[in-house]
Amino acid sequence: MAVGGLQNRIKIVPHFMRLHEWIALEEGYWENEGLEVELLGEVMHHVSTHAGSRYFERPQDRPFREAVQVANSACEWGSVCNAGAGMGKFVPDLYGVARFAIFARPESGLTRLADLRDVPVGVGIMAGSHFTTLRALEAVLPRERIRIANIGGPGRRLLALRAGEVAAATLLDPEIPIADEEGFVKAASGEFRTLFWVSPEIPAHLLTGYFRGLRRADQALRAQPKKYMPLWARNIAPGLEGPYDYGRFGLGELLVFERYPEDIFEATVAFARRWGLDRDMREDSFNALSISTLAE
């Protein structure tokens, strides 16, 4: 790690859906930026394995509730709603694109979205799985026929699917390739945006260095994917360890170094409002909820 005193230290929660934080660490990209980075891997695993915690009490909420200065990531809906509820701000200077898939147990007979009428789908509330599931199901089912179950984090959801606690659950990377390998039925899949969700007290130069390191990591991953596939082992949730062929896991979440569009932000807020998921938001304007690292 680079030295440089407290002014160059930043705490980061690695995002389990991507490899970028580990690549940046291993390749020394942050050290080159003069950053001293503390990766909070235990928080990442708690996020993945929590069992249906309530909003504001989830592992990803705690650093913000406890005034710990941290850089995290979440789906676009979650990042915006969290910021609106007073938990950090989102960074509009870049975004991620991640995968989701709704899987069902093989014996359930559930093979497509239309089969999920009145079937509880396991999600983590106010997180990517929650919003993507609603968005996918509302395209084919009446609202009154859509059911969700707050099972918890993505690792916990795969464990619940294995145990038969739910017939269907929405999974993310790296659980998607594991579920594929284990023979669960993919009823639907798609992609969604993620945003960086950060403590507003973090100095802009630290976030700028963090993102520059991630840009280099994104370029390295796209250029030499095979080199970095073994790093997926670090994102496997406790309880899911296994002798996996990480070469089949794919790239995971990728980053787009373009501004998050304000019209998409408005659609994100409107979606949350339509489903009544904005109840804790005290603010809903782009400028109030975002913090840019770029000079105007």
Predicted regions and their residues:
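Short, glycine-/small- and polar/acidic-enriched structural segments
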Residues: 2-141, 148, 187-189
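Residues within well-ordered alpha-helices
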Residues: 20, 26, 78, 156-157, ...
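Positions that flank functional sites
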Residues: 45, 78-79, 176, 194, ...
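Short Asp/Glu-rich motifs
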Residues: 48-51, 180, 198, 291
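A ligand-binding cleft/hinge motif common to bilobed small-molecule-binding domains
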Residues: 72-85, 134, 162-184, 270-271
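Pocket-lining segment of extracytoplasmic ligand-binding domains
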Residues: 148-149, 153-235
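Secondary-structure end/capping motifs
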Residues: 204-279
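Conserved C-terminal helix/tail region of periplasmic/extracytoplasmic solute-binding proteins
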Residues: 273-296
